[in-house]
Amino acid sequence: MFRLLTAGESHGKSLVGVIEGFPANVKIDIEEINRDLGRRQRGYGRGGRMKIEKDRVEILSGVRGGKTLGSPISFLIENKDYANWEPYMNPEAVDGEEKRVTQPRPGHGDLTGTLKYGFDDIRNVLERSSARETAVRVAIGSLAKQLMREFHIEVYSHVTAIGSVSLGEPVENIEKIKRAEDSEVRCLDPEVEKAMIEEIKRAKEEGDSLGGIFEIHVTGVPRGLGSYVQWDHKLDAKLAHALMSIQAIKGVEVGCGFDQAQKKGSQVHDEIFFSQEKDYYRKTNYAGGIEGGMSNGENIHLRCAMKPIPTLYKPLRTVDIETKEAVLATVERSDSCAVPAASIVGEMVAITVIAQEFLKKFGSDSLEEIRKTWKSYTSI
C-alpha cells in the first residue's frame, strides 16, 4: 500500500517526506521534482519567503542509480530560512521569548491548537500548521506523477477565480489548460488574468488577502479505480478527503458538483454510448469521471475553493492567550494570495490519490508486474 508521511516545521531545519509502497524499477527524474517544487513557489501574490527559499529535494533512501528500489523512499527539503531562525527553532535549546506568539489569528489553527496541546506559545502550532508543509506533498506528488505517466495518466490545473474576478465558462480542453503554465496566476484568459492581478494588488495595498477557485483535470485514468463496496473505498471520497487536507481549502466539487442540485436528472447524468473504436464512452462529463465511487474512464474533473489566507497585514481583533486582553492578531510573513500555488499542490495531491488507487488495483511490487496487470485489464 502506497502510504506517505510528512514532517517538519515551517522555519525548522528541513521538511521531510517518507513514502512506503512505491514500486521498484520506476525511473525517477529528480530535476522534474525540483521543477514542480518551483511551480509551487511561483504565482502573483506570493510573499517574501519565496525570495529566500529555492526548494530542492534531496533523496535519502529508496532510489539507486535513478530507479526506485521498492523500499521506503525518504527525502528532505532544506529550509534556507532556518539560518535566520536557528536561535528560536533549535531542537535542543531556544531563545523563546523574542519569537513567542500569544495573539492567535482568526481563521488559523492558532488558538485551538494551543489549547488542545497545552502550549503557552502559539509558535508551536503555527510552525507545523503552516502551508509550508505542502512542499513535501508536491515532491511526493511529483514522484506519483512520474509513476502514473508510465500508464499515460497526466494531471493539469488552472485557476478559475480569484476574489470577485472569475473566468466564466468552464474550460475542459486539455491543450488550452496547459497554457496556465504561462500565466502569473495560472489563468487561461489574458484579460481575466490582468483583472485578477489588479484584485490582488488592491488587497495587498489594503493589508488584506484573497482566496479563489482552481480546477484539476486528470486524464487517462482507467475505469474501475475506487469501489462502491464500502463507503471509505470510494474514489471521490478519497480525493475530497485529500484535497480538503490542503491548508485553506474549504470546498471540493466533483464534476458539476453543486450545480447539479439545481437541475433535473435528465440534465446532469452522462448518457452511455458504445462503438467498436471507442468501446463504452460518454459525450458529456457532468459526473467528472467518477460514478458510484469509481473512475468511469472519462477525465476526472475536480474543483477546489480556497479561503483567503488568515494572516493579514491589517490584523483582526483577537484575545491574548496570556493576558486575556483584547489585542490585534499576530502578523507573520505571508502571501496576499496563494491560489495559483494551491492549484499546483492540488494537482500533486490528486495524482497521489490516483496513484494509490491505481496500485491497489494493479499491484505495487514492481513496474513490470504492474504493467502486465494493467495491460491485461485494459485490453478486455
From Swiss-Prot:
Pathway: Metabolic intermediate biosynthesis; chorismate biosynthesis; chorismate from D-erythrose 4-phosphate and phosphoenolpyruvate: step 7/7
Sequence positions that bind NADP(+): 40, 46
Binding site for FMN: 128-130, 247-248, 292, 307-311, 333
PROSITE patterns documented for this protein: CHORISMATE_SYNTHASE_1, CHORISMATE_SYNTHASE_2
GO cellular component: cytosol
Enzymatic class: lyase
EC number: 4.2.3.5
GO MF entries: chorismate synthase activity; FMN binding
Catalytic activity: 5-O-(1-carboxyvinyl)-3-phosphoshikimate = chorismate + phosphate
Record's keyword terms, sorted: Amino-acid biosynthesis, Aromatic amino acid biosynthesis, FAD, Flavoprotein, FMN, Lyase, NADP
Cofactor note: Reduced FMN (FMNH(2)).
BP GO terms, sorted: amino acid biosynthetic process; aromatic amino acid family biosynthetic process; chorismate biosynthetic process
InterPro entries reported in the protein's UniProt record: Chorismate_synth, Chorismate_synth_AroC_sf, Chorismate_synthase_CS
Function: This reaction introduces a second double bond into the aromatic ring system.
UniProt xrefs under NCBIfam families: aroC, PRK05382.1
HAMAP family noted in UniProt: Chorismate_synth (MF_00300)
Quaternary state and interactors: Homotetramer.
Protein name as annotated: Chorismate synthase
